[in-house]
Curated annotation (Swiss-Prot):
The gene is AHL1. One of its GO terms (cellular component) is nucleus. It comes from Arabidopsis thaliana (Mouse-ear cress). GO terms for molecular function: DNA binding; minor groove of adenine-thymine-rich DNA binding; sequence-specific DNA binding. It is found in: Nucleus, Nucleoplasm; Chromosome. Residues 49-66 have a biased composition (Pro residues). Residues 270-287 are annotated as: Required for nuclear localization. This is AT-hook motif nuclear-localized protein 1. Residues 1-127 are annotated as: Disordered.
Amino acid sequence: MVLNMESTGEAVRSTTGNDGGITVVRSDAPSDFHVAQRSESSNQSPTSVTPPPPQPSSHHTAPPPLQISTVTTTTTTAAMEGISGGLMKKKRGRPRKYGPDGTVVALSPKPISSAPAPSHLPPPSSHVIDFSASEKRSKVKPTNSFNRTKYHHQVENLGEWAPCSVGGNFTPHIITVNTGEDVTMKIISFSQQGPRSICVLSANGVISSVTLRQPDSSGGTLTYEGRFEILSLSGSFMPNDSGGTRSRTGGMSVSLASPDGRVVGGGLAGLLVAASPVQVVVGSFLAGTDHQDQKPKKNKHDFMLSSPTAAIPISSAADHRTIHSVSSLPVNNNTWQTSLASDPRNKHTDINVNVT
């Protein structure tokens, strides 16, 4: 048995020999008598290194265990790193493009709409910057959206140039022609009922007699009699004002099929008698000139000089609209004050309003 006395620096060895004596070894004895100290901690790892034997000193005090000091230092360092990482203040402003060593900083591949960052901190050596929490999300415009105001303005301009393309003033009509009546005269009489222009779209029925214009330049006509099925009927009649007399200009063309399969057609030059009830589809619209005449003309604003006016109180808010409409008229600056004073419509009326 060996006893280590720290106060005196002496080691006592008990031997169980024949004499049963006790040998006392002092600190200045040879190294064969020294024994390594035992650690008091019971949970040491089996791979721990045994510290070297204590060196003799003047005070004969043993140094603290080396293993315990190492474990304490490692634990303290880890704790300090955790505290410094948790209390690190997040920097604001634009992130750096280059790192301290001059290398380009890699951006985070995460999108802006990703989930919040995890609770654990990245390793100190990584240079990954996350913009999900620092930058604001910008408004994303849908791909199928467009400027409706600009589109509406373009349509209005197109209507001024070609009103028929917009289709807002186009009205369809159906004309029924009884047996024995002239289809041409029926359409012309319908077009004379108003100032609108007429276009013939289609027709169906049977014709008993038709007069067509010859295609040559002689100006002759051809008349066909029998039963002919209407294949197509088209034309237009436009209003015309010449010398104060309102008239119609235009014409129609027709294609007919005979019972034996022959097809005849051309420009109508006379009667188109119906052999059965005939339905004609026409459309009425305003021509380009009529459309521009009926549009309200915009008043051109002339520049005028006017003296500054005083502020108008709330009690005379009703009179403010009258003064504003009169002041916007292009009148002379010299007679502006006189016209306002002489006009009885511009008299101010005192209105008392109790505001609670």
